[in-house]
Design a protein with these regions (language model features):
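Structural signature of Gram-negative outer-membrane beta-barrels, strongest in the C-terminal barrel
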Residues: 281-283, 403-413, 439-574, 662-668, ...
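Membrane-embedded beta-barrel scaffold of Gram-negative outer-membrane proteins
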Residues: 335-339, 345-361, 503-505, 511-517, ...
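Gram-negative outer-membrane beta-barrel transporters
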Residues: 183, 457-462, 566, 572-576, ...
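Transmembrane beta-barrel wall of Gram-negative outer-membrane proteins
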Residues: 198-300, 328-330, 446, 498
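N-terminal periplasmic "start-of-domain" segments of outer-membrane beta-barrel proteins
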Residues: 39-71, 96-99, 127
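Face-selective signature of the C-terminal outer-membrane beta-barrel domain
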Residues: 279-295, 323-480, 487, 503-505, ...
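Extracytoplasmic beta-strand/coil segments of soluble accessory domains associated
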Residues: 77-124
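Short acidic/polar hinge/loop motifs at secondary-structure boundaries
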Residues: 120-154
Length: 751
């Protein structure tokens, strides 16, 4: 196993500096200096995306300042972990396959929610899985974030039907004056499960630099991450190989006896991210902005055997594999916006995301020889990517406070999949050999939409809207050695999605909002065409005959303002026809994933959210949520079984209960102490709910995880923090083994 000693030399300065910052002498000196040197700081509260665009959606948010106090964050997606009904399936620090689930959608359905950064789409709608369909979170550095808003449900006409889970809008900062920062993070996870016991470290370094000179503002950020993971998968079999001892007796997710023979997916990843943002004010009411982002990843993964022979030598079971990944991805966007706040405003945003290099080399031979080379495959996804164009206008015939505010727009996107896999005689260094499989195709969507916010009376507001979409999949091609090449037929579909929301505000403290929305979620190009083995070892099978999901969503939200807080209760229901649900199956040591249409599912429930500042005592902030969801399969004519049924069973990947609770105590403007808890009920991953055993590889446990963080602002330049995720060292599975107790340390300097 690779050396992952807990305190490598490059981290010693960070750890020493962090310890020094926490010493009483340093604190006393800094307090004296700050009293004389620190100017008064005025914090401007930014508005959410929903408020800016008058969108009729329930929205929960977190600002950069709040995240810095409360969240042990190495990557931007970490900042979402305490928002109501949001779970990012992140298996380890640096995981590039981290889809987001919501109150009605599962953790393996990346295309059922949307993630944007300043209007640039980060959701990889080339697939709907937890692999290459995962959002490109890594294109945003935590240090550039101003705020993150999560909008629940498909009630805004300006978003595609993929919004029926949620829309996450990341707003990043642009400077008004010179500013710069450097930050160092480190983390250590002590992991012990089956025959693997080790400490896995991660370290991150980031820097930002920005300024404004007249009409031009610019921002540059860079980020470097070096991380080691715990096992991602395990090798199992009904019995251990003859002549071997060791292994661990267990049961699979259906309760059958198995032996855990070894671990796979012990991953070392090194990632770099750089981004340049430019904005120019042509006039006080017209601004253009350009963003260019680059990300690269070099990762290698290996296996570990738990078996020995009578002499004590290692026995290597089949199923162990090594792989290396080389990735380079580019994003760019150009936007032009008017901001008169008069009768008419407009904006245009065009973006491109390109996977310029994406090579995964995987061994197929037997260990131990395969660790150093030999037969394998090379999967090449280079050339995959997407383009988007959005046009929007806002008409205010009676001004910003008039009876009508009409917004309308057009949208176009195209997604391209390129995914050949080649055989090679030397998996870690050889060139392409014979073509093994090939998957190609494109999808495109055109749409027009409109929305009218109509103030019926002083305390009544109605929002009417609709979206019409034209979709097609074309250029589909699949190749396999056994069957040869197949050109898939072109597929077209279209439809209208109406939206309606009515809000009643009888006083300053109460608001009642009823919303209804229809959404169409068209199949992704990957669901239709991609046949590939991912870096996680899972084979994903396509289905070119999939139908679009048709979603009817409704919500009644009741919100009451409190003194320095709020409480909200939401009743919601979601009916999905032709639900696209991914299933997994294991044949021998091979795990396969496939997608099928389910006739109808229904998810309905209730959500309670509380936020209160100065709760009980001054300086104590409480945030919490509790959600119950009854998620059921109502029809599934494609399921055939002599022994079981899927109708009436729970919808896969949606838990019955979820809860979060976060308490942050700020005795002054320097210290912030946070204790947080996250709970999720168990999940089912099969349509007939036969995965009765949760605590196993490919099972889905219920879990309660507690985290803590303490942050200290030393002076106007220096800040430091320490924290722990999973304080009680909860051992749990969400298909994969999830991180155990992890320690964090952070040191930051703002110029």
């Amino acid at each position: 196993m690779k050396n992952t000693k807990p305190f490598p030399f490059p981290l010693r300065p960070l750890l020493l500096a962090t310890i020094a910052a926490w010493s009483p002498l340093t604190q006393a000196q800094s307090q004296a200096e700050d009293a004389a040197a620190l100017p008064e700081v005025v914090v401007k509260e930014s508005r959410s995306v929903s408020e800016k665009n008058q969108l009729p959606t329930t929205t929960e948010s977190i600002t950069a300042a709040k995240a810095a106090d409360t969240v042990n964050a190495m990557n931007v997606e970490d900042t979402l972990k305490y928002l109501p009904n949001v779970l990012v399936r992140k298996r380890y620090i640096g995981d590039t396959q981290a889809p987001m689930s919501t109150r009605t959608t599962g953790i393996n359905a990346g295309a059922r929610s949307l993630i944007y950064a300043d209007g640039m789409l980060l959701s990889a709608l080339i697939n709907n899985n937890n692999g290459n369909g995962s959002p490109r979170w890594f294109m945003v550095a935590p240090e550039e974030v101003e705020r993150i808003d999560v909008l629940y449900g498909p009630f805004a006409a300006q978003y595609p039907g993929n919004s029926y889970g949620a829309v996450t809008e990341i707003t990043t900062r642009m400077p008004d004056h010179f500013e710069a920062s450097v930050k160092a993070n480190t983390a250590f996870q002590d992991f012990s499960q089956y025959g693997t016991s080790n400490t896995y470290r991660a370290q991150e370094f980031s820097a930002t630099l920005g300024n404004r000179s007249g009409d031009l503002s610019w921002w540059f950020s860079a980020n470097h991450l070096d991380s080691y993971s715990q096992p991602v998968t395990y090798v199992t079999a009904a019995t251990a190989p003859a002549g071997s001892v060791g292994g661990y007796a267990a049961q699979d997710r259906t309760g059958k006896n198995i032996v855990v023979l070894g671990a796979n997916g012990l991953t070392h990843t090194v990632q770099d991210n750089a981004k340049l943002k430019l904005a120019y004010d042509f006039s006080p009411t017209l601004t253009a902005a350009y963003t260019l982002g680059y990300w690269q990843n070099r990762a290698d993964s290996h296996g570990q055997s738990y078996l020995r022979n009578a002499a004590g030598a290692t026995v290597y079971p089949s199923g162990l594999a090594s792989n290396t990944t080389e990735q380079e991805q580019w994003m760019q966007s150009l936007s032009v916006r008017s901001k008169t706040q008069g009768v008419f405003d407009w904006e245009a945003v065009v973006s491109n995301f390109s996977m310029s290099k994406d090579l995964t080399r995987t061994s197929t031979g037997l260990y131990p020889a395969a660790q150093n080379g030999g037969n394998g495959t090379i999967a090449d996804a280079g050339g995959t990517g997407w383009n988007t164009l959005d046009l929007k206008g806002v008409w205010r015939p009676d001004g910003v406070k008039g009876a009508h505010i009409v917004s309308f727009g057009g949208h176009y996107d195209q997604y391209k999949l390129v995914s050949p896999t080649y055989l090679t005689s030397n998996w870690n260094a050889g060139g392409n050999g014979a073509l093994s499989t090939d998957s190609r195709g494109k999808t495109e969507t055109s749409a027009v939409w409109a929305q009218d916010v109509w103030r019926l009376a002083q305390d009544w507001k109605a929002t009417f809207g609709g979206r019409y979409e034209w979709w097609r999949a074309f250029g589909g091609y699949n190749y396999a050695v056994a069957s040869g090449g197949i050109n898939q037929p072109e597929v077209r579909n279209s439809g209208f999605s109406p939206k309606l929301s009515v809000a009643w505000t009888p006083g300053e403290q109460w608001q009642f909002t009823g919303s209804f929305g229809k959404a169409l979620r068209f199949p992704t190009v990957g669901e239709l065409y991609q046949n590939v083995q991912g870096s996680d070892g899972i084979f994903r099978q396509p289905n070119p005959n999939l139908q679009p999901e048709r979603v009817l969503s409704s919500e009644l939200a009741i919100e009451r303002a409190l003194d320095k807080g709020k409480v909200r209760v939401s009743l919601f229901q979601e009916d999905v026809s032709n639900a696209l649900i991914s299933q997994t199956a294991t044949l021998g040591t091979v795990v396969s994933s496939y997608t099928q249409n389910i006739d109808k599912t229904r998810q309905r429930g209730v959500e309670l959210v509380l936020q209160k500042d100065d709760a009980l005592i001054r300086g104590l902030e409480i945030n919490g949520s509790l959600t119950y969801v009854d998620a059921r399969i109502l029809g599934n004519s494609s399921f055939v079984s002599a022994t079981s049924t899927s109708v009436g069973k729970r919808t896969p990947y949606v838990p019955e209960w979820r809860a979060t609770l976060v308490g942050t105590y700020r005795p002054d403007d320097k210290w912030a102490y946070t204790l947080a808890g996250r709970y999720s009920g168990r999940l089912y991953s099969t349509v007939d709910n036969n995965d009765v055993n949760t605590h196993t590889y490919q099972g889905f446990d219920s879990y309660v995880v507690f985290d803590a963080r303490v942050r200290y602002k030393i002076d106007k330049h220096w800040s430091t923090a320490v924290g722990i995720d999973n304080i009680t060292n909860k051992d749990y599975f969400l298909f994969h083994p999830f991180p155990q107790r992890t320690l964090f340390a952070e040191l930051k300097y703002d110029f």
